[in-house]
């Protein structure tokens, strides 16, 4: 049982870490775009040169640099489009790899070993329908009321792998949501401004007539 549990935990860790692996591979592909790096370096060099020359005194050179900049900018945009297309192809390939190596085997393993007992709980600690759910999994919700599945005799109730995984994933998801809420950037409070129309109307209010003695 321990070996199967370790295999399932390994699949679970890989499934949770896969978005990070996906992101790292995409960043690696973007960082290793040699042509884009060269084009960006050339553009920075020309921009630095443009700041040091005068458009009036060195008009020919200044115009030539501008044309070169336009050409480089177009090449940069084309290279970015090709890079995005490459990233999309990489994403599609990674999805197929994940489906074959993680999703399908993990799903089959969960169905195949879903009823495997993980640990025992004292009987009577939870209501009877929960104990049946722990022991038989989700099938107890349908078969329990028909008395087809019953809680076993004895002083303890086993917790099946399917229910244990469900509880574990819920805990991991909740902790992830808490972490995201704690690390999310604070949203600044909206500034309250007075409507200029209201200010104009207030300034144009006629004076109040004072009583004449």
Swiss-Prot record:
Coiled coil stretches, renumbered: 55-99
Keyword Transmembrane helix: yes
Transmembrane region(s): 5-25, 99-119, 159-175
UniProt GO cellular component terms: endoplasmic reticulum membrane; GET complex; Golgi membrane
Pfam families tied to this protein: CHD5
Function comment: Required for the post-translational delivery of tail-anchored (TA) proteins to the endoplasmic reticulum. Together with GET2, acts as a membrane receptor for soluble GET3, which recognizes and selectively binds the transmembrane domain of TA proteins in the cytosol. The GET complex cooperates with the HDEL receptor ERD2 to mediate the ATP-dependent retrieval of resident ER proteins that contain a C-terminal H-D-E-L retention signal from the Golgi to the ER.
Name of the protein this chain belongs to: Golgi to ER traffic protein 1
Organism (species): Kluyveromyces lactis (strain ATCC 8585 / CBS 2359 / DSM 70799 / NBRC 1267 / NRRL Y-1140 / WM37) (Yeast)
Recorded name of the encoding gene: GET1
């Amino acid at each position: 049982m321990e070996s199967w549990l370790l295999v399932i935990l390994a699949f679970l860790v890989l499934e949770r870490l896969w978005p990070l692996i996906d992101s790292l591979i995409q960043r690696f592909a973007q960082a290793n775009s040699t042509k884009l790096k060269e084009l960006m370096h050339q553009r920075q060099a020309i921009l630095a040169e443009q700041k040091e020359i005068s458009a009036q005194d060195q008009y020919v050179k200044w115009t030539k640099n501008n044309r070169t900049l336009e050409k480089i900018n177009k090449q940069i945009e084309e290279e970015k489009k090709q890079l995005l297309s490459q990233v999309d192809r990489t994403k599609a390939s990674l999805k197929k790899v994940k489906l074959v190596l993680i999703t399908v085997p993990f799903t089959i393993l969960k169905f195949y070993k879903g009823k495997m007992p993980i640990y025992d709980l004292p009987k009577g600690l939870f209501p009877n329908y929960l104990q049946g759910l722990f022991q038989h999994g989700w099938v107890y919700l349908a078969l329990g009321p028909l008395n087809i599945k019953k809680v076993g005799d004895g002083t303890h109730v086993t917790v099946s792998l399917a229910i244990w995984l469900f509880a574990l994933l819920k805990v991991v998801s909740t902790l992830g949501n808490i972490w995201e809420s704690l690390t999310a950037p604070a949203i600044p409070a909206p500034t309250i401004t007075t409507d200029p129309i209201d200010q104009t109307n207030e300034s144009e209010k006629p004076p109040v007539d004072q009583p004449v003695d």
